């Protein structure tokens, strides 16, 4: 799972943090820690459990070197998944009659320190790189030069459901907007995570005519991640999918984020303003912080260079055609990400095998395909999607959502399989997004069939719903869900142990006490959900008034 998605549960990071591309090295593991070593007792596994384990043994082996998107090892893993889809009797649904959909990627990073200056009363004050500001790479242009007056817009959030419009009373057309990082802690988890992201804030700004943004660090930001650490990471590459001209796709529609200003940089920006930076910084510590937007007596000039490195990877896509002539044109998507974070670190063991994240999700996807084929095609078609570059920012799923290999209007639901922690016998399950649409009753029936309870989100403040591949379908208006084993009984301790000890580390391998029979239960629940959706008399719709269903104009219950 993408680092931002879960690391927040156990270590505090800024909401706008982005997973970085891991450097590739040539080191391999010593034989004593090979992930192929058995981790559980010698008791024979059921055929279903053995099948799941066999997939994970291959995908999480040292030979796959962490399955980093763009690597040759990832390509081998993709061919393996394609062969398994073929063996399950699925039809190819990728490019050119094959199982693969090529995903053009581009890695980008700032080229040099850039330049930022503040002009006030005819005098220009240059800001200091690493002390006052860190520039932001622009995936759409090699050279970004902007100069415009600055308007402060609080958090930069527009959320009528919270009585908040941080743009009320100010005109930002042709201006650069400055907003404090994050979002008010009083907001609820899933919506807070979405509203607090830099991409969402840039979208609000662009819709109102702004031409650029800058993010302001607050004392809370500094406590979560010191600005010096942000500056240290500025040389790391980020990634997105590439446009035909080689530039990168951006969600926010092209408006550039210019820089992040430190506490000292923000203080310099607010010299001469009606409201002092000290007052704003103090207000930002409140759970429901409120700011008065204002035009600052300052023009900000920015010059930032961005370097680009092209790469390629692929999604793996297969189809089981539906059996009902009237409903077969509608498609239920089952998805899981195939990539992991590759090879990095200074220890002897540098290979991040990604057994639970997310080789076991891919194994579950393959086994669900085999079960569909065994039990017969449902009324609707089912598309099986193994995506690349989830760890880089949900990129493969975003590419598919924008370049679907089936008509976009035909996709009616998504069920996503991402990092089920299966090191214990689970007593409950959590369905992220399950209460937002008419998928809810379907999910409840499937979970009950496993003899476990359906529990509410145990960590709502982390906004997990917006942080995995299914959210790319949500952004297209498609009702979506993904499930985790819950935290009842031994679950809480097992999840906390995995997150603190093995998550995004080389120890996420087959030396863990993975309960393979629990994988069979996990597959069964998700299969029942997908089968029920595909055989239902009507397509799922968003519950009336749901925030994300309304925001992304999805089908809504009356």
Task: Describe the residue ranges of each PLM region.
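Sec-dependent N-terminal signal peptides
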Residues: 1-20
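N-terminal hydrophobic or amphipathic helices/low-complexity stretches enriched
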Residues: 20-94, 265, 329, 558
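Noncatalytic luminal/extracellular "stalk/propeptide" segments of secretory-pathway proteins
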Residues: 54, 65-184, 295-296, 308, ...
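Soluble metallo-hydrolase cores and metallopeptidase-like ectodomains found primarily
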Residues: 119-121, 129-169, 250-354, 367-370, ...
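Extracellular/luminal Protease-associated
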Residues: 127-249, 321, 329, 350-353, ...
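Metal-dependent peptidase/peptidase-like ectodomains
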Residues: 142-143, 168, 242-279, 377, ...
């Amino acid at each position: 799972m993408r680092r931002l998605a879960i690391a927040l549960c156990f270590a505090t990071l800024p909401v706008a943090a982005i997973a970085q591309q891991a450097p590739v090295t040539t080191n391999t593991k010593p034989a004593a820690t090979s992930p192929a070593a058995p981790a559980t007792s010698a008791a024979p596994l059921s055929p279903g459990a053995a099948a799941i384990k066999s997939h994970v043994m291959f995908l999480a082996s040292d030979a796959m070197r962490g399955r980093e998107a763009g690597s040759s090892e990832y390509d081998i893993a993709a061919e393996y998944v394609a062969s398994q889809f073929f063996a399950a009797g699925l039809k190819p649904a990728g490019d050119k009659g094959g199982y693969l959909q090529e995903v053009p990627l581009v890695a980008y990073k700032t080229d040099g320190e850039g330049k930022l200056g503040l002009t006030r009363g005819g005098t220009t004050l240059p800001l200091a790189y690493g002390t006052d500001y860190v520039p932001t790479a622009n995936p759409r242009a090699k050279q970004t030069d902007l100069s415009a007056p600055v308007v402060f817009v609080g958090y930069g959030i527009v959320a009528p459901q919270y009585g908040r419009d941080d743009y009320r009373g100010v005109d930002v057309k042709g201006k650069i907007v400055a907003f404090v990082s994050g979002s008010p802690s009083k907001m609820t988890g899933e919506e807070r995570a979405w509203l607090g992201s830099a991409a969402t804030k840039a979208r609000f700004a662009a819709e109102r005519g702004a031409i650029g943004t800058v993010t302001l660090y607050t004392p809370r930001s500094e406590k979560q991640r010191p600005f010096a650490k942000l500056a240290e990471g500025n040389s790391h590459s980020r990634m997105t999918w590439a446009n035909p001209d080689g530039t990168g796709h951006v969600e926010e529609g092209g408006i550039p984020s210019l820089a992040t200003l430190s506490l000292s940089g923000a203080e310099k920006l607010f010299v001469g303003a009606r409201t002092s930076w000290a007052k704003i910084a103090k207000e930002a510590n409140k759970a429901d912080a409120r700011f008065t937007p204002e035009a600052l007596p300052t023009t900000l000039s920015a010059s930032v260079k961005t370097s680009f490195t092209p790469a390629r990877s692929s999604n793996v896509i297969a189809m089981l055609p539906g059996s009902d002539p009237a409903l077969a044109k509608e498609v239920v998507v089952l998805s899981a990400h195939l990539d992991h974070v590759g090879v990095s670190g200074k220890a002897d063991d540098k290979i991040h095998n990604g057994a639970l994240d997310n080789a076991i999700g891919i194994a579950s996807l393959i086994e669900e395909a085999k079960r569909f084929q065994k039990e017969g095609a449902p009324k609707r078609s089912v598309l099986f999607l193994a995506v690349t570059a989830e760890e880089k920012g949900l990129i493969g799923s975003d590419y598919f959502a924008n370049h679907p290999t089936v008509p976009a209007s035909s996709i009616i639901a998504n069920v996503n399989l991402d990092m089920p922690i299966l090191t214990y016998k689970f007593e409950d399950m959590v369905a992220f997004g399950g209460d937002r649409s008419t998928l809810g009753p379907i999910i409840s029936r499937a979970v009950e069939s496993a003899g476990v309870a359906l529990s509410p989100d145990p960590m709502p403040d982390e906004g997990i719903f917006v942080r995995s591949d299914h959210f790319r379908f949500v952004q297209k208006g498609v009702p979506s869900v993904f499930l985790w084993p819950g935290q009842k009984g031994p679950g809480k301790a097992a999840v906390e142990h995995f997150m603190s000890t093995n998550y995004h580390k080389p120890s996420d391998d087959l030396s863990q006490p993975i309960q393979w029979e629990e994988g069979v239960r996990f597959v069964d629940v998700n299969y029942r959900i997908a089968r029920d959706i595909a055989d239902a008399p009507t397509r799922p719709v968003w519950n009336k008034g749901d925030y994300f269903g309304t925001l992304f104009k999805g089908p809504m219950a009356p």
